[in-house]
Amino acid sequence: MPLVHVMLLSCGVAADAFACSIARGTAIRVNIIKRSLILAGIFGVFQALMPVIGWGIGYFFAELSFIRAIDHWVAFLLLAGVGAKMIWDAFHQDADVDVIDTGAVQLRPALILGLATSIDALAVGMGMAFVHAPIITLALAMGLTTFVLSLVGAWMGHHGGGRFGGWATVIGGLVLIGLGGNILFDHMLG
């Protein structure tokens, strides 16, 4: 898998965590660096682990002979479906975001958000098993990219950038749809 695809995929799955970090960052009032690092770390770890789990599930199914004939369609549908859902969610979520008034990063809500934003990475990991992508490289890239973007997102949110979260999710969704289309297109040409 080309490096540019790895980076685009990583940015695509990190979009939800980035948007959540912006929202959470609006509530961080003290210990900004420490709390932003904790939040970004939680998101990064989840985004690194979930595609590995998804890849393991997908690998089992990818080895079944009847699925090999349609593996490119499965990867496309998973990526396009996740991307479309991200775009839908960006326009159909409540404006009332659950923020913490004290500015503290409470562990339980942060873990729940980490899990919720990484479900997409689980599905992407499943899709990547069908195209035999290098999951360790992808998982590390997804985790690191999510960590960095979440750190930036928390900082942006703290400094009044809450209005960018929804658009980040839309762009991430479009990237995933584009990558799914690229997998399908490459398979049909090759």
UniProtKB/Swiss-Prot annotation:
The gene is mntP. The keyword Membrane applies. InterPro entries: Mntp/YtaF, Put_MntP. The lineage of its organism: Bacteria, Bacillati, Actinomycetota, Actinomycetes, Mycobacteriales. The chain crosses the membrane at residues 37-57, 64-84, 111-131, 135-155, 164-184. Disulfide bonds: none annotated. Keywords: Cell membrane, Ion transport, Manganese, Membrane, Transmembrane, Transmembrane helix, Transport. It is a multi-pass membrane protein. Coiled coil: none annotated. One of its GO terms (molecular function) is manganese ion transmembrane transporter activity. It comes from Corynebacterium efficiens (strain DSM 44549 / YS-314 / AJ 12310 / JCM 11189 / NBRC 100395). One of its GO terms (cellular component) is plasma membrane. It is found in: Cell membrane. Probably functions as a manganese efflux pump. The keyword Transport applies. This is Putative manganese efflux pump MntP. It comes from the Bacteria. It holds the Pfam family Mntp. Signal peptide: none annotated. Belongs to the MntP (TC 9.B.29) family.
